[in-house]
Amino acid sequence: MYYAEPIARLIEELTKLPGIGPKTAQRLAFHILHMEPSVVEGIARTLVEARAKVKYCSVCCNLTDQDPCQICADDGRDHSTICVVQEPRDVVAMEKTREYHGVYHVLHGALNPMEGIGIDDIRVKELVARLGDGRVQEVILCTNPNTEGETTAMYIARYIKPLGVKVTRIARGLPMGGDLEYADEVTLAKALEGRREI
């Protein structure tokens, strides 16, 4: 199909986003081209600004525009409990429950030997470093209930258990193979409430 070169490039760039195939990219491209120029410029500016200003929190590895992030800097949170999640969007899902008042640690992935993702590719060393001061009493493993998430949780549990920290895993109730970000707040709250020691 023939497109003007700028349209073809826009479609190609949009397909680099997760979940955006060629047809969706084409629809988005034509929609963008029909938008007011000021709106398109605003979106472009916001993308560039977010990419430039958002970084990793030096404590929990979550995405933030301040360091430490708002959660880590909050003295009202329970800093003796760390909830370990795979992705930043999982922090958002857990916060929506309004049941968890501790702090987080974001791994930015899960172990997946088939895809070459090993322990050095996720933020486990940073987690272990946080446990060194004796302040943390419990680590709640909230990785996704799929093969990669379960493998990651078991590895982390075995790795940090000798440090004398209580290690728990969120309860079932989340569908096997699902992602935390898609679970509703009530299910997540119940899974957190029913966590078990491993």
Swiss-Prot record:
PROSITE patterns: RECR, TOPRIM. One of its GO terms (biological process) is DNA recombination. Residues 80-175 form the Toprim domain. A zinc finger (C4-type) spans 57-72. SMART domains: HhH1, TOPRIM. InterPro entries: DNA_Rcmb_RecR (IPR000093), Hlx-hairpin-Hlx_DNA-bd_motif (IPR003583), Rcmb_RecR (IPR023627), Rcmb_RecR_Znf (IPR015967), TOPRIM_dom (IPR006171), TOPRIM_RecR (IPR034137). Coiled coil: none annotated. It holds the Pfam family Toprim_4. Keywords: DNA damage, DNA recombination, DNA repair, Metal-binding, Zinc, Zinc-finger. Belongs to the RecR family. May play a role in DNA repair. It seems to be involved in an RecBC-independent recombinational process of DNA repair. It may act with RecF and RecO. This is Recombination protein RecR. It comes from Symbiobacterium thermophilum (strain DSM 24528 / JCM 14929 / IAM 14863 / T). The gene is recR.
